[in-house]
Design a protein with these regions (language model features):
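Short, solvent-exposed loop/turn segments at secondary-structure junctions
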Residues: 9-12, 46-54, 92-96, 127-128, ...
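Conserved strand-helix element at the start of the C-terminal RecA-like helicase core
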Residues: 5, 28-40, 82-104
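Short, well-ordered amphipathic alpha-helices
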Residues: 69-75, 86, 103-110, 181-187
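Coupling/switch/interface segments within P-loop NTPase motor domains and analogous charged loops
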Residues: 15, 61, 65, 71-79, ...
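Conserved RecA-like P-loop NTPase helicase motor core
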Residues: 111, 115-195
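Inter-lobe connector of SF1/SF2 helicase motors
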Residues: 1-61, 72-75
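Soluble or luminal CAZymes and related metallo-dependent hydrolases
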Residues: 6-10, 36, 61-69, 98, ...
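Short helix-terminating capping/connector loops at secondary-structure junctions
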Residues: 30-33, 80-85, 115-118, 191-194
Length: 195
């Protein structure tokens, strides 16, 4: 189901700014090496994900995709504790790195809501085949209840759907084939959520 979030004041202002940038590019008023539609599209996608990705001076906002995702994940987590059902959060922008990133932000927020750190994992931390196998096995067993990863890291070819109850796309993948990884056979839980 779709989780609709109203635009924040900062996002509205930023969208006005990038609309002006797009018009300048269309009119040829700016060199393509300075600004272009690809940069504008990327900045728009980052802003839609979390305004802090385009303006680091902003504070945490509840009125964002990340804030809503964290609320949804926590609600589902506690509602499905008995069966140890699992969730995937897909995020292609702002993957784990030093400094501010969405993955660490989500993890901190989930921990603050009472989800144990050892039940939250980043697919990016499994940097060998052995670690990937162990991580995915832990997700299938319900030891890891929330896994965050990019479409590339945990999309096509990754089979962790056994206990999967929800998928959360906080940014949209470029390829339609990358959506809907939860709809598989041989699952413990048949009624699932995709947000």
């Amino acid at each position: 189901k779709d989780a609709l979030i109203s635009k924040s004041y900062d996002l509205k202002k930023y969208l006005e700014e990038i609309s002006k940038r797009a018009e300048a590019v269309r009119m040829g008023a700016v060199l393509r090496t300075v600004d272009n539609m690809l940069k504008i599209t990327t900045d728009g996608r980052k802003a839609a994900l979390d305004m802090r990705l385009v303006d680091s001076s902003l504070s945490v906002g509840c009125q964002s995709k990340v804030g809503r995702c964290v609320e949804n994940v926590a609600n589902i987590y506690f509602r499905t504790m008995k069966d140890r059902l699992t969730q995937v959060i897909f995020c292609d922008y702002s993957t784990p790195k030093k400094g501010f990133n969405i993955y660490d932000d989500i993890k901190v927020r989930l921990k603050n809501l009472g989800i144990p750190e050892n039940e939250i994992a980043f697919a990016h931390s499994a940097n060998t085949e052995k670690k990937r196998k162990q991580l995915f096995d832990d997700v299938r067993k319900g030891k890891i209840r929330v896994i965050l990863g990019s479409t590339f890291k945990i999309g096509m070819g990754v089979n962790i759907q056994d206990r999967l109850i929800a998928l959360h796309y906080i940014d949209v993948p470029w390829r339609p084939a990358d959506v809907g990884r939860i709809l598989r056979t041989f699952k413990i839980k048949k009624n699932v959520e995709v947000t």
